[in-house]
């Protein structure tokens, strides 16, 4: 069992135990038995010192071979050994009662600093093992579509009602529906069984029941009968049969006196509702049934049954039958109608709130299943039956008795147990089946699975898909067939319906070897298949898998340039029989390989005896010694790079290598050389930190290199890029107040690189003193939304903990992390009202106005005209209609500015003013020097008397005259017979010009 996985399971599972326990014992936490005998409470596990955590981890490692002696207890008092959690799955294991023998006699109670000052007697606090555990008394089948399972006592309705817990050996039959009543369970099959055939029924997963297998023989030699007939409405009659029918019978009411206008028969039903054309008036009536057939092809014998019609005046009732996080099953007291009418609405928690509105998934008899987008609150919850229109269609029984609007209560215990992998099995050399403990999401996404070989190489997958949803079985499919041997499948990113995230799980998968071996190309950069020249007289030929030693060392399986190998040539299997060294050293006259030399490899065998497919494979031989075969480089830690070679490397030293962290090459501090499958994995430790994205990280060899392969050839690397195999680092947490009201409503967590969104869940975080309402991930930032407190917490810097793991975009995981104090990112509460410009309180404007504000946190703007709100008004919108206005501007902090003003813009003036006519006149020559043109008068409908605005011009049509103004006009009139024309013009304020008026004056 993978210790790392176990430690992660323990850490993550305990998150569910934070809630206050309602039980006296056993206390929640981890009980380590064996020779250790220590009890770690949930609170202690979350707040231990680093030294105490290290001790805890070492103790778990010490118990890795005996996880039956490590017991986990949740806050509800449910518990199981870690071994049981892995082998049975958490849903089954935690459903079984704890027993005294699960615990040691006394445990030392561990404090946060790792010390122990008290003891805990968990064994004494467990109820004695109950007698009379649940048993299956009998299994029978009286027809070909139903199986009756009888228990020795009433069963747990939730687990007994799950069809996934009933399976038939060899999957010959499948259960479609389960009906639970006391200690009897009726299974309805998806397809009929064969008559007189026997099957094995497995019952496993029901609370209190050990897995039970019973033989059930299907033998149907009886005709179906009419079990009951009842009036369920004024025009509805229900006919119940003794078993499911495959074909519909005929029905007649009162010998045909009342027509049957419709029925709801479907194949496989036991109940048929007849809709009549008229309401029976007699107290006693008859239904005649004939024909139809059961699944053994026996017909219903003709029979006439009486039924009485008694008016029902009692309205139906409804209650909660079953509830999960986002789904509720309601059960009515009788058959009802109109449940799915658009006038019928269901809510939970708050009536009328769209976020709590339900969607009907289906109606089955008297039951309706409703789903919700937002989950139910834990504990007691409310379901509201509401009607959109009071006088609209309502739920009623078939007699028309209406169900009134009402509130139904129920109890929901939130699922806090993460799903587990219960089985991993290779079905073929391209398919691996994975079984989960419960219904999960994400198991059909191949990105949530990683398959590796024993050397750590990643095996490409083509897809992941469901095999059997009812049994939670999925499969992953490989791109190429797998060679025989062991592989490692890692599963992560999976969650159940309650958003509980699967702890990363790795399983060893054994695959039978049916794949033929082949020769491996050791130089993919050149055409053809190439060997490795390890010395002037030796070549290494590699294979795709471990080979039969005798086969690859047999000279008869090789030819050199078309001829049999010289008798002096030796063949030696190497690299765990995945390669062979062909040595020409002792061949007389051999001076080395030339261009074009090749060795042909025949049908050598792998360890399973599979021969190579091709009769001969030509392998090209280099004419110069090859550098040691290198595979890849990976950044695996803050200061570590791993180099993977395809062969054994010896004498490697730190000064053989340099690492570039993106800022230039630097020397390596130290190295380690691990050998896996006779191939070296060299770990380089650097002094400079490496980016978690591996961006710009490169490796090269420097100077005189001591690192060589077993044939004495030095390693040669030039600017080799390193892949990203390191998870993200958590940099900081910062408080946020989005509405600037002095209360924290978000925490912004920044990581060293962009995160894979699906890897981040609410349950990955804890914040001291705050309730998490949701998370959002964008790039490297995780925004945690929290419920605002009722106090001013703008200066708070609570402790933030990342208790789960998060992944980068390449699915590299990190976490949990050490808790951090949040950085104070919240300013003091905003108490300053918005500043409104463009209008002033109390002013009246005779032109259009445009209110505005430079504040950036405006939340609402309300404008009223003459007391009535103008919907949709926004700042910067001109106001040009006359009226009395009230403008209310509110910022995010709730500060408000109110401005009252008026707009009174005069009506547009389009009428020209009028000038009163001035009459022509005569002027005596003697009076000319003092003459002035008579005054004219002008009026305007808007501006009034505008006589003072009249403009006067002077002119003369006399020959040679130069009259332009009053003075020249006076001079001109000094001669008898001369004339002067005076013209009067005026324009009102709106720019409308009057019609000009003229008068002519003649000198006499």
From Swiss-Prot:
GO terms for cellular component: extracellular region; S-layer. It comes from the Bacteria. Keywords: Cell wall, S-layer, Secreted, Signal. Residues 1-24 form the signal peptide. It is found in: Secreted, Cell wall, S-layer. The outer cell wall layer is composed of subunits of the outer cell wall protein. These proteins form a hexagonal array with a lattice constant of 14.5 nm in the outer cell wall layers. The outer wall protein binds to the middle cell wall protein. This is Outer cell wall protein. It comes from Brevibacillus brevis (strain 47 / JCM 6285 / NBRC 100599). The lineage of its organism: Bacteria, Bacillati, Bacillota, Bacilli, Bacillales.
């Amino acid at each position: 069992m993978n210790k790392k996985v176990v430690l992660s399971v323990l850490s993550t599972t305990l998150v569910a135990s934070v809630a206050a326990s309602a039980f006296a014992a056993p206390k929640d936490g981890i009980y380590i038995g064996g020779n250790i005998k220590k009890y770690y409470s949930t609170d202690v596990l979350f707040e231990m010192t680093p030294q105490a955590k290290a001790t805890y981890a070492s103790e778990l490692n010490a118990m890795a071979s005996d996880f039956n002696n490590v017991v986990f207890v949740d806050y509800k008092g449910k518990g199981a050994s870690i071994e049981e959690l892995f082998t049975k799955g958490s849903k089954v294991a935690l459903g079984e009662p704890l027993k005294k023998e699960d615990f040691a006699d006394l445990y030392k109670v561990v404090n946060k600093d790792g010390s122990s000052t008290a003891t805990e007697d968990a064994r004494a606090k467990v109820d004695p093992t109950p007698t009379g555990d649940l048993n299956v008394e009998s299994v029978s089948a009286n027809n070909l579509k139903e199986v009756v399972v009888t228990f020795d006592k009433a069963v747990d309705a939730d687990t007994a009602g799950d069809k996934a817990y009933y399976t038939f050996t060899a999957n010959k039959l499948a259960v479609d529906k389960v009906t639970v009543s006391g200690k009897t369970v009726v299974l309805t099959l998806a397809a009929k069984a064969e008559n007189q055939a026997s099957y094995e029924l497995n019952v496993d997963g029901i609370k209190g029941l050990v897995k039970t297998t019973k033989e059930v023989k299907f033998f149907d030699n009886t005709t179906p009968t009419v079990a009951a007939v009842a009036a369920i409405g004024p025009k509805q009659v229900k006919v119940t049969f003794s078993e499911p029918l495959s074909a519909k019978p005929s029905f007649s009411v009162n010998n045909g006196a009342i027509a049957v206008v419709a029925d709801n028969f479907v194949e496989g039903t036991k109940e048929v509702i007849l809709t009549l054309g008229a309401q029976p008036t007699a107290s006693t009536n008859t239904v005649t049934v004939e024909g139809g057939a059961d699944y053994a092809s026996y017909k219903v014998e003709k029979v006439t049954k009486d039924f009485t019609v008694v008016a029902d005046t009692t309205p139906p009732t409804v209650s909660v039958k079953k509830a999960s996080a986002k789904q509720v099953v309601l059960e009515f007291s009788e058959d009802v109608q109109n449940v799915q009418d658009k006038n019928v609405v269901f809510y939970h928690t708050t009536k009328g709130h769209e976020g709590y509105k339900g969607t009907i998934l289906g109606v089955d008899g008297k039951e309706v299943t409703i789903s919700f987008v937002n989950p139910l609150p834990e504990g007691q919850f409310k379901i509201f039956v509401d009607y959109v229109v009071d006088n609209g269609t309502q739920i009623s029984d078939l007699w028309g008795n209406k169900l009134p609007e009402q509130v139904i209560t129920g109890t929901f215990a939130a699922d806090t147990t993460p799903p587990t992998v219960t089985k991993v099995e290779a079905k073929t050399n391209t398919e691996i089946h994975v079984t989960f403990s419960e219904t999960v999401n994400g198991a059909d996404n191949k990105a949530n699975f990683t398959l590796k070989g024993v050397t750590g190489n990643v095996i490409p997958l083509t897809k992941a898909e469901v095999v059997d949803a009812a049994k939670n079985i999925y499969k992953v499919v490989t791109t190429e067939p797998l060679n025989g041997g062991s592989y490692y499948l890692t599963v992560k990113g999976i969650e159940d319906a309650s958003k509980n995230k699967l702890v990363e799980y790795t399983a060893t998968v054994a695959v039978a070897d049916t794949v033929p071996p082949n020769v491996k190309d050791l130089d993919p950069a050149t055409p053809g298949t190439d060997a490795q020249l390890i010395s002037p007289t030796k070549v290494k030929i590699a294979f795709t898998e471990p080979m039969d030693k005798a086969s690859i060392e047999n000279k008869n399986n090789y030819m050199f340039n078309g001829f049999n190998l010289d008798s002096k040539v030796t063949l030696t299997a190497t690299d765990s029989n995945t390669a062979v060294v062909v040595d020409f050293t002792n061949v007389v006259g051999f001076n080395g390989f030339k261009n074009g030399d090749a060795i042909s490899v025949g049908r050598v065998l792998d360890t399973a005896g599979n021969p190579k497919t091709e009769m001969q494979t030509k392998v090209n031989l280099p004419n110069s010694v090859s550098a040691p075969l290198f595979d890849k480089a990976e950044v695996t830690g803050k200061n570590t790079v791993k180099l993977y070679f395809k062969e054994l490397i010896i004498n490697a030293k730190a000064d053989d290598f340099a690492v570039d962290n993106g800022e230039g090459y630097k020397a390596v501090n130290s190295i380690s050389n691990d050998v896996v499958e006779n191939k070296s994995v060299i770990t380089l430790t650097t002094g400079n930190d490496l980016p978690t994205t591996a961006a710009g990280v490169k490796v090269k060899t420097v100077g005189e290199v001591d690192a060589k392969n077993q044939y004495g050839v030095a390693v040669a690397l030039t600017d080799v890029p390193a892949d990203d195999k390191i998870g993200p680092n958590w940099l900081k947490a910062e408080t946020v107040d989005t509405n600037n009201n002095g209360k924290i409503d978000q925490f912004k967590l920044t990581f060293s690189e962009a995160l894979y969104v699906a890897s981040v869940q609410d349950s990955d975080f804890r914040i001291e003193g705050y309730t998490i309402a949701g998370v959002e991930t964008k790039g490297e930032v995780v925004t945690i939304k929290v419920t605002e407190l009722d106090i001013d917490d703008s200066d708070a810097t609570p402790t933030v903990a990342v208790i789960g793991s998060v992944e980068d975009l390449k699915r590299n995981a990190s976490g949990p992390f050490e808790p951090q104090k949040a950085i104070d990112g919240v300013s003091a509460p905003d108490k300053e009202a918005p500043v409104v410009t463009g209008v002033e309180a109390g002013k009246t404007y005779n032109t259009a106005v445009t209110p505005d504000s430079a504040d950036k946190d405006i939340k609402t703007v309300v404008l009223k005209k003459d007391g009535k709100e103008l919907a949709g008004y926004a700042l910067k919108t001109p106001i040009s209609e006359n009226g009395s206005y009230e403008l209310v501007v509110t910022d995010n902090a709730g500060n408000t500015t109110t401005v009252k003003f008026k707009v009174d813009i005069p009506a547009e003036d389009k009428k020209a003013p009028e000038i009163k006519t001035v009459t022509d006149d005569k002027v005596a020559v003697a009076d000319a020097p003092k003459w002035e043109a008579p005054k004219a008068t002008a009026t305007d409908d808007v501006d009034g008397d505008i006589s003072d605005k009249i403009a006067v011009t002077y002119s003369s049509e006399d020959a040679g005259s130069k009259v332009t103004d009053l003075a020249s006009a006076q001079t001109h009139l000094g001669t008898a017979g001369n004339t002067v024309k005076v013209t009067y013009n005026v324009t009102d304020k709106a720019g409308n010009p009057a019609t000009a008026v003229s008068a002519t004056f003649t000198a006499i």
